[in-house]
């Protein structure tokens, strides 16, 4: 199973490092056939919140098939306005088994039209999609 974690400039470090650690530990202990990787729009280093720099394993153009896509939260204002990012998320949503988010990553899923009608309560607020 291929688990891709989408990262971008100003992504929240815990939002991608936490899932990466959990799934890579599960792989080490039980799920040897899992492949966990970070994906960014390009292969260039990404500067997450707090100046934390990370090198994605893949870009939009060279990643393997994704079974599970995790879209992380962070300062996503610029991502919400990138047509190529939204198109990529929407495309992966049509081919992946699961597309999920951490925290405010849900806004990218909503903007990419990957959510049906749902009610969410991230960070104590209520949003209708």
Name what the model sees in each region.
Residues 105-106, 126:
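Alpha-helix capping/helix-boundary segments
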Residues 115-129:
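A conserved active-site-flanking secondary-structure segment within enzyme catalytic domains
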């Amino acid at each position: 199973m291929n688990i891709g974690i989408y990262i971008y400039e100003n992504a929240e470090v815990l939002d991608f490092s936490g899932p990466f650690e959990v799934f890579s530990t599960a792989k080490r202990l039980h799920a040897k056939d899992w492949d966990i990787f970070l994906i960014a729009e390009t292969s260039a280093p990404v500067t997450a919140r707090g100046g934390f720099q990370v090198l994605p394993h893949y870009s939009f153009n060279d990643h393997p098939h994704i079974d599970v896509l995790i879209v992380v939260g962070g300062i996503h204002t610029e991502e919400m306005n990138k047509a190529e990012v939204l198109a990529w998320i929407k495309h992966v949503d049509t081919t992946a088994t699961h597309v999920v988010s951490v925290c405010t990553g849900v806004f990218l899923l909503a903007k990419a039209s990957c959510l049906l009608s749902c009610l969410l309560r991230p960070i104590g607020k209520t949003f209708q999609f």
